[in-house]
Amino acid sequence: MVRATPIHRYRNIGIMAHIDAGKTTTSERILFYAGVCHQMGEVHDGAAVMDWMEQEQERGITITSAATTVFWSGMDKSMPQHRFNIIDTPGHVDFTIEVERSLRVLDGAVFVLCAVGGVQPQSETVWRQANKYFVPRMAFVNKMDRTGANFDKVVEQLKARLGAYPVPMQVPIGAEDGFEGVIDLLKMKAIHWDAASQGTVFEYRDIPIELVDKASKARAFMVEAAAEATEELMDKYLNEGELKEQEILQGLRERTLKVEIIPVFCGSAFKNKGVQAMLDGVIHLLPSPADRPPVQGLDEKGNECRCKASDSEPFSALAFKIMTDPFVGSLTFFRVYSGVLNSGDQVYNSVKLKKERVGRILQMHSNQRDEIKEVRAGDIAAAVGLKDVTTGDTLCDQNHIITLERMIFPEPVISMAVEPKTKSDQEKMGMALGRLAQEDPSFRVKTDEESGQTIISGMGELHLDIIVDRMRREFNVEANVGKPQVAYRETIRKSDVKSDYKHVKQSGGKGQYGHVVIEISPMSDVDKQHPDVKGDFLFINEITGGVIPKEFISPIEKGLRETITSGPLAGFPVVGVKVKLVFGSYHDVDSSEMAFKLAASMAFKQGFAKANPVLLEPIMKVEIVSPEDYLGDIMGDVSRRRGVLQGQDDSLSGKVINAMIPLGEMFGYATSLRSMTQGRATFAMEFDHYEEAPANIADTVIKKT
């Protein structure tokens, strides 16, 4: 089958932003103008197409990344048809995992900002994630019709707070109630959209006299930014003082693809102004899969190899999301980097080392689905029938094996106990939690060995609330939920602590014998770079002369690794520890894997107790935005919560207070901040680092366990 859309006309893009920037409304307008929806859904009505989960429609926030495909031929229909695969990502900090895995498979992004609120805490988090994956992006300053809208100030904030190099492509005509349209700096014409046609009809007009000077200056800045792309363009610009429209676009595109500049558009998605021109910008300025560097991976022998975005290359794809669909079961969302895949084909999972057959391939439109026969390089689709795939797995041609770089997901920072309300809920709950954990790598489930309770862990209170809510709605499981608990960690402060343990049992017949001598130390920065570090723990075997036979070394390491999952201090995971196996002995008859495993575990527990063990608590980076009147109260409250103030900034919506606060002090903070400021302040927090808990806090936590 011939490819319907050439790969250079593909755009795999994400719509990214903080909460309330109008991201989902912007996505809805894209669907409307591209002809996918014949009626617009509004977030505040709970009718947005991209927000398809019940909780999303109720809460008015996007939780999971909905994927959809649309086609665009330009605002004036003059361009060849381009295919946009769009992912709408959540803006709440508890769901940054969704943003992270979307960015991993996208080629470009549209960064939606609120013209009133400007750059918010979540904007910074998302920006850092986009930098990590070197994603070219452009900005859309939305809500230009709102009271307090200020385009220039937002552009300034992009520079000051995100370290970006923004290049405005437009100048707004008016603001707030007087927002009429935009000036296109390429054509030096004003664009006015017709309200009666919901923005589908537009016209070019002359630039209003009072804005000619401002537009000329902005255009000169844009042309200069384009000229800096190459020496050839710069020479032409210096000699002629101007560049042609095509040359400007060429220069800007080149610099956008290198993530040197951020082209900035503006409008009001709600008032149907500006999204249309921004879509033209996606075609002109964001990359196709063929413009991105070939994706890197490792072959069977561990050598580095690359996949070019071409149909003629062997098939390779990355599974970036697993979802449970009520009608078809498990859906695996994947991005094809190279080659072609037909429904019914076999794929090789190079992470699990397994072959699987792809049943059906679906093109997703939010939670609607169309069955398709094949996918090609650059496509994003969902597969039905893959049984043993998890997020981050590579799917490839079994004759050309490659493992693409895996995604690294953050460790959960908050836990709570859940128990089924009735016996019939018991079995269903296990299945539901298993499915949800498969979908979301930042959500973990475990059973507390002592109490037998099921413990769920995630990235924040809202994250776990929604998990419990989904259990009830999608799996019909009613559960009681305990209080949120902090995910503490344990470590040591003393170095080179020796621990000698001999496990001996003799009770007639074959006995048990295992003897190990270990040295325990905190991991240094050099240790952290050691190739054998796994999960913040380093095991080094220094046995010589066969005092412990080789076959018992692996059980010793296994015994240590099992022990560190529940530390001796208070049962929390142990981190940042190095263990050297330095000596031991064995018995020809009585030694076994189990005996050495037990000896290693006991040696570690004894050594850990002597190595000055400490409890670590998660510290959150908190940003509070508030009117100035409440600053004193808020700062006093931060101090009472053992917070450390990091400084203040000005924002378009008030003062910004930055602080580091222990997670244990942040439960219920939303309610307390609301009552302190009459609901006028907002906050966002994300995990920053672990640090030693004060003795009184550590004692309380240890006594509870």
UniProtKB/Swiss-Prot annotation:
Q: What is the source species?
A: Xylella fastidiosa (strain 9a5c)
Q: Which Pfam families match?
A: EFG_C, EFG_III, EFG_IV, GTP_EFTU, GTP_EFTU_D2
Function noted in UniProt? Catalyzes the GTP-dependent ribosomal translocation step during translation elongation. During this step, the ribosome changes from the pre-translocational (PRE) to the post-translocational (POST) state as the newly formed A-site-bound peptidyl-tRNA and P-site-bound deacylated tRNA move to the P and E sites, respectively. Catalyzes the coordinated movement of the two tRNA molecules, the mRNA and conformational changes in the ribosome.
The record's section on PROSITE patterns has: G_TR_1, G_TR_2
Q: Which NCBIfam families match?
A: EF-G, PRK12740.1-5, small_GTP
Which residues are recorded as binding GTP? 17-24, 88-92, 142-145
Biological process (GO) annotations? Answer: ribosome disassembly
Q: What is this protein called?
A: Elongation factor G
> Keyword annotations for this protein?
Cytoplasm, Elongation factor, GTP-binding, Nucleotide-binding, Protein biosynthesis
Its family remark reads: Belongs to the TRAFAC class translation factor GTPase superfamily. Classic translation factor GTPase family. EF-G/EF-2 subfamily.
Q: Where in the cell is it found?
A: Cytoplasm
Q: Which SMART domains match?
A: EFG_C, EFG_IV
* Single Gene Ontology MF annotation: guanosine tetraphosphate binding
Entry-linked Gene3D superfamilies: 3.30.230.10, 3.30.70.240, Elongation Factor G (Translational Gtpase), domain 3, P-loop containing nucleotide triphosphate hydrolases, Translation factors
One Gene Ontology cellular component term attached to this UniProt record is: cytoplasm
- Lineage of the species this protein comes from: Bacteria, Pseudomonadati, Pseudomonadota, Gammaproteobacteria, Lysobacterales
Using the record's annotation, list all stretches that form the tr-type G domain. Answer: 8-290
Q: Which InterPro entries match?
A: EFG_II, EFG_III, EFG_III/V, EFG_IV, EFG_V, EFG_V-like, EFTu-like_2, G_TR_CS
